[in-house]
A protein has these predicted regions:
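Feature for soluble, non-membrane regions of globular proteins
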Residues: 1-193
Length: 193
């Protein structure tokens, strides 16, 4: 059975307030976990394995399974993509700078891409064929479904920011950069580069 990852609300303040996090974490994220558990029961594999092996599930359940598995994984990736520790250089950041020319250029491209997202979904920094890419995926689509490895996730569903930012999604996107967890992203990068 899948369970929620731990989340310390203090690590995301003041960028996202407690009321917003409580709704997001305890209602939206929890609903995806509950739905996935009811669909796959005691399936003894990771959410990533469910996504990668969706063809092994009952054809009539696949659509619901992939939406809820994506919902669980994307939320976990999003929550793990943030903390309030100061930004530090690491191999991931060094390689981002090599590919994008500067950290500021990467940041600007990521923000520009996120601001172009229409409707609900996520902006991801992914690793694809050994290179970085910044992609927008709708709803609960997941990079693993497209043979990409997610490194950073920004949730652009309104429930992720609305209670804190109301309709100022651009400010939410900009503020996200003050709490990106590059240490977590680097750990994934080092395992998959």
């Amino acid at each position: 059975m899948f369970k929620k990852i731990k989340l310390d609300y203090k690590t995301l303040a003041p960028v996202i307030d407690d009321k917003n996090l409580d709704l997001h974490y305890n209602k939206h994220y929890q609903k995806y976990i509950d739905n996935l558990n009811s669909l796959v029961g005691d399936y003894n594999q990771s959410v990533v394995n469910i996504i990668k092996n969706i063809e092994s599930f009952d054809k009539n359940k696949r659509s619901s399974i992939i939406v809820n598995a994506g919902g669980v994984y994307n939320h976990e990736m999003y929550f793990r993509s943030m903390n309030n520790k100061p930004y530090t250089n690491n191999k991931l950041v060094d390689d981002i700078v090599k590919q994008y020319g500067s950290y500021d250029n990467f940041k600007n491209i990521f923000i520009e891409n996120a601001n172009k997202m229409v409707g609900s979904g996520y902006t991801f920094l992914v690793l694809k064929d050994g290179k970085f890419d910044i992609v927008n995926l709708p709803n609960q689509d997941n990079p693993y479904s497209y043979n990409m490895i997610p490194l950073i996730a920004l949730d652009l569903w309104e429930h992720a920011y609305y209670l804190t930012y109301y309709n100022d999604r651009a400010q939410y996107i900009n503020n996200f950069f003050s709490i990106i967890n590059f240490d977590y992203a680097n750990m994934i990068y080092e395992k998959n580069k």
